[in-house]
């Protein structure tokens, strides 16, 4: 049985992470769980920026940002759907794996 540690990350934090020099490129982000009945309407409206984040696999490791992991358990996961103007929309569950 897997144990996940959940964090709720607000859009302004997420966008700061994305635009920071090498924090976001340190992670491989995979879409894990989507509460499709809730999120589908937002996905249908479409946000190309969001889809780019979810689809792109970034494997460049960061030497400046290190996060502690407990064994091999996935660590961070909740990010928010971003609107065109980066306001908070809705949470989706992500698995984020540190690329070492």
UniProtKB/Swiss-Prot annotation:
Protein name: Putative uncharacterized protein YOL035C
Additional information: Partially overlaps YOL036W.
Membrane topology of the entry: Multi-pass membrane protein
Keyword set includes Transmembrane helix: yes
Subcellular location: Membrane
Recorded GO CC terms: membrane
The entry's keywords: Membrane, Transmembrane, Transmembrane helix
Transmembrane segments: 9-29, 41-61, 72-92
Keyword Transmembrane helix carried by entry: yes
Phylogenetic classification of the source organism: Eukaryota, Fungi, Dikarya, Ascomycota, Saccharomycotina
């Amino acid at each position: 049985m897997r144990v996940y540690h959940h964090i709720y990350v607000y859009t302004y934090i997420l966008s700061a992470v994305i635009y920071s020099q090498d924090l976001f490129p340190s992670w491989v982000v995979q879409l894990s769980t989507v509460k499709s009945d809730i999120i589908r309407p937002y996905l249908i409206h479409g946000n190309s920026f969001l889809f780019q984040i979810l689809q792109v696999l970034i494997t460049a490791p960061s030497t400046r940002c290190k996060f502690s992991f407990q064994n091999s358990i996935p660590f961070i996961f909740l990010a928010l759907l971003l609107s065109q103007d980066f306001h908070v929309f809705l949470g989706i569950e992500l698995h984020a794996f540190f690329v070492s």
